[in-house]
A protein has these predicted regions:
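Short, solvent-exposed beta-strand edge segments and adjacent coil->beta transition regions
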Residues: 5-7, 104
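Residue-level signal for pocket-adjacent positions within structured domains
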Residues: 5, 12, 91
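Periplasmic peptidoglycan-binding/anchoring modules of Gram-negative envelope and division proteins
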Residues: 9-42, 62-70, 107, 114-117
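Pro/Ala/Gly-rich low-complexity, hydrophilic intrinsically disordered segments
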Residues: 1-2
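Periplasmic OmpA-like peptidoglycan-binding domain that tethers envelope proteins to the cell wall
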Residues: 44-117
Length: 117
């Protein structure tokens, strides 16, 4: 797999980017500007109603997208956004630490000549 991923964490019930998340995205900008495709996938833990989690997952992905586009609008044609509020957890949701890891957005990107899965 040749995709690369940047993980952006979020607080419980929030789609607001933290200063650390903004810094991480800004630090990766030179690489992202060279990417052929960028997919931003918003995710949640399993607490709360499904409809809320789907909406929150989308809001997280859009927050990342909006931050990237606010400084580099030329990324627009390379970006896509998905929400995955009810699946694909990277950690068990039965612990606080696991739920914290699942509250994230993934910025998955391919460089020139590669394709996203």
């Amino acid at each position: 797999d040749t995709s690369r991923t940047i993980i952006v964490q979020f607080d419980l019930g929030s789609a607001k980017l933290s200063p650390a998340a903004r810094s991480s995205l800004n630090g990766a900008m030179s690489t992202l500007l060279s990417a052929r495709q960028i997919m931003i996938v918003g995710r949640t833990d399993n607490t709360g109603p499904l409809a809320f989690n789907e909406s929150l997952a989308l809001a997280r992905a859009l927050a990342v997208r909006d931050h990237l586009l606010s400084t580099h609008p030329r990324l627009t044609p390379t970006l896509s956004v998905k929400a995955r509020g009810a699946c694909c957890f990277i950690a068990a949701n039965d612990t606080l630490a696991g739920r914290t890891q699942n509250r994230r957005a993934e910025v998955i990107f391919q460089m020139s000549g590669e394709n996203l899965p």
